Amino acid sequence: MDAGSSRSLENAVNKIYHDQLVPKINTSKKMSTLAHPPNILEMPQEIKKNCGGKQVEITLERIKMTKSIKEKQSNDLEKAAFKRKAEGEEKPTRKKEAKIIELDNQLITMPLPHIPLKNIMDVEMKLVYIDEVGVRYEFVESFMSTGSQPTCRVAEIVDPLSVPNFSFLPQIDKWLQVALKDASSCYRQKKYALAAGQFRTALELCSKGAVLEEPFDASAEDIASVASFIETKLVTCYLRMRKPDLALNHAHRSIVLNPAYFRNHLRQATVFRCLERYSEAARSAMIADYMFWLGGGREQSISKLIKLYWQAMIEEAITRAESFSVMYTPFATKIRADKIEKVKDVFTKTHPAYAEYIYTDLQTLHMLPQTVDWSSFPPQQYLLTLGFKNKEDGKFLEKISSRKLPIFTEHKTPFGLTREDTVRQMETMGKRILPILDFIRSTQLNGSFPASSGVMEKLQYAGLLSQLQRVKEQSQVINQAMAELATIPYLRDISQQEAELLQSLMADAMDTLEGRRNDNERVWNTIQKVGQIEDFLYQLEDSFLKTKKLRTARRQKTKMKRLQIVQQS
């Protein structure tokens, strides 16, 4: 496909999103885990300000739907907890005390486990590269009463024997169905380039309105589900062709269109793995496992496979990291200051080469795939400690713990950066800051929004790329940020103010991708400027207080000298 038609297709696809959106293994290093050994999971035998009215409607609809899903899961957990309490209250108490004893008395450093590459590939073959024999499109509504069906809509080609026959499901447009059948036929014949071309044609048909047989009665969710399915098939085609760079944006878009389907996140994890972006792959796998549980998934074999993949990606991220090392500390009670100091002492003894700067994440708690159980409340949680060889590499983390607005600048004049300053700041963000934040978030499901979500940093990084006219990289970063934004309502409860901010960020991100200009500044740039002004005011205050302190000390010294002179005379 030539460049002109590629741009045409990109614009056509973006038009659909605009209307339907809501929002080789190195074992030389060690990861420390206190008390709990990180065992390898066993392999078992066998998912604006509105640019258009629909975008806000779908965002709000998804937020409401997510709340109802979480309420149901919460009610189930409360019932289970009440049942355990009725059976006997002594048993949980003994278990809690055992955890405290482990933390206090058994500070053990465990070697990093090794998960063979074959196991990782097995997971991908079973959950990512699935090729369904029968063509079936599902628009599954919530089955809250049964608890056995997915609770969010999904569009997927599946084996017809694996699901009930729903007669009310919307019918696909006949021309689109022909294009998809031809593409699937090419895929099964391992003609992946031809299949990708057919799927691109299908996507273009979608952009022209040929999605469902009754387009005027179709909901935006149903249309988005079909488009998401086509995007996922393009992801698998490009992965088969060993072109993960081409698959990346399609993986992001599939999540934007259908964030509730766990396989979309797992496919994104596979793309990140192929690109050797292991921290991001780990986070995607973690979200996939959570979405599988949130959607009513009950097959433990699938969850074990996803957790194995998540664990493998964390392992690889740690072994590849050169500037820092990590330690996870399990705990069951409130974190006390003496415990934090004890953890830091253990870290210093365990990793003396990484003790120039030690950071303990007190903002949010972390989970590991070896022990996480989404159905238990709360799941086993860990305190994350990072140590750095170079103090400057981790110093920016101070701002994360002390500021609500995530901004990073190394310049005294942040509002008038030269091109050289912009390049320097872009490299700092891309090579030092974002990789560490991505690693922190690989075991952190629901950090605060926007401060700990990682989205603002990515959008600010995209702004730097835009200033340097690196359009392709900017597009990828924005697509990734949009996928994160679309997923946030499923991971945590958000307030009305946060929902409005999320919609504004999504709308501005969409406008940026489409090349639209308006008189208003992008939301993330405004937030960054507010943060920079706040930084400037803090610096002025610090400078004033230091000057005042020096002046007071000088006056006191002068006064003492005068008294001494008077006494001597």
Swiss-Prot record:
Keyword Transport (UniProt): no
Protein location: Golgi apparatus; Cytoplasmic vesicle, Secretory vesicle, Acrosome
Pfam families reported in the protein's UniProt record: NYD-SP12_N (PF15015)
Alphabetized UniProt keyword annotations: Cytoplasmic vesicle, Developmental protein, Differentiation, Golgi apparatus, Spermatogenesis
Cited InterPro entries: SPATA16 (IPR029161), TPR-like_helical_dom_sf (IPR011990)
GO CC terms: acrosomal vesicle; Golgi apparatus
Domain of life: Eukaryota
Signal peptide extent: none
GO biological process, one term: spermatid development
PANTHER family per record: SPERMATOGENESIS-ASSOCIATED PROTEIN 16
Purpose: Essential for spermiogenesis and male fertility. Involved in the formation of sperm acrosome during spermatogenesis.
Family: Belongs to the SPATA16 family.
Protein name per UniProt: Spermatogenesis-associated protein 16
Record organism: Macaca fascicularis (Crab-eating macaque)
